[in-house]
C-alpha cells in the first residue's frame, strides 16, 4: 500500500509469469502495464489484503473441492510456475474438471494466446451445452500406467 500502482504496476507487469506476454506481444503488454498502473492503489491493496492474504490455501479446501461436479475447465500457462502444481491438484481433485496447458505461456494466457484460449473455452462450452461433458472415469484416477487396480504400476 506504500507504493502507488503507478510504481508497483510496472514491477508487477514484469513479474516472472508475465514476461512471456511482453516477449510475445510488446505492444499488448505495454497496454496491460498501463492498465495495471491505472488501477486504484487503495483498491489493489484491499484486494491483496482482503482476498489474497485471507483466503485459505486451495490445498486446505480439498474436501470441499472434491464435491464439485459442475463442468470445470482449468487453463494454465506452462511457464506459470506458481500455478502449475495448483492446477494439477485441482485437476486431480475435481472429478468434473479438465486441464489445458498453454505452451510457452505465463499467467496471462487469455492475453498471450487469445485465439487458443477462446478456442479452448468455446469447445468447453459446446461440450457442456451438448451434454458431452462427463465426470472423469474413476478407473483413470491412479498413478499407475498398467492397471487401475495396480497402485504400484507392477
Please annotate each region the language model reported.
Residues 97-154:
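Catalytic active-site module of serine/aspartate enzymes centered on a nucleophile-bearing elbow/loop
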Residues 81-86:
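Conserved alpha/beta-hydrolase "acid-adjacent" motif
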Residues 2-65:
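Conserved alpha/beta-hydrolase catalytic His-Asp/Glu region
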Residues 42-44, 68, 106, 141:
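Conserved Class I S-adenosyl-L-methionine
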Residues 62, 88-89, 115:
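Active-site phosphate/pyrophosphate- and oxyanion-stabilizing loops and adjacent acidic/basic residues
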Residues 68, 74-76:
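Short beta-strand/loop motif that positions the catalytic acidic residue
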